[in-house]
Amino acid sequence: MKLAEKLAAMSNEQATKEEVVTNEIVNFFVEKFETGEMMDAFEKSLGKQEICLRKKSIYLEFWIYVPGCFGTYFGLLGKEWKPENDHDYEHKGVNLKNIYKDVLHEIAELTKENFEEEGFEVKILPNEKNKRFETYVIEISW
């Protein structure tokens, strides 16, 4: 076990339930960036017009369960983290409605850092158009 992993495990033992769940969700996206899945998904999502404009907007979302439609999840570039029961608002005893803003903020910052490391310019904006669920628009330009 690497030292960072050992220390993370020790920290998680001391963390609150909310911190543990927040870390689990954010680490899901950390792993997707580390394996290159996010950059691959971004590249595949580009159309001719976006390439010409040198800009693409992606969406970081928190969906709340809607009966008959969608389950609860955090999503970015087609990658979705879902709780134990995606027809619920809780994961490991934590109400996701109480932590989603912190989780979205951390994922947005993670996204910004990773795209900037690849040489992109990044702006993070709240999505004012969609009132049904929480969304950030992340503008990526090159």
Each model region followed by its residue ranges:
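Short amphipathic alpha-helix segments
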Residues: 108-113
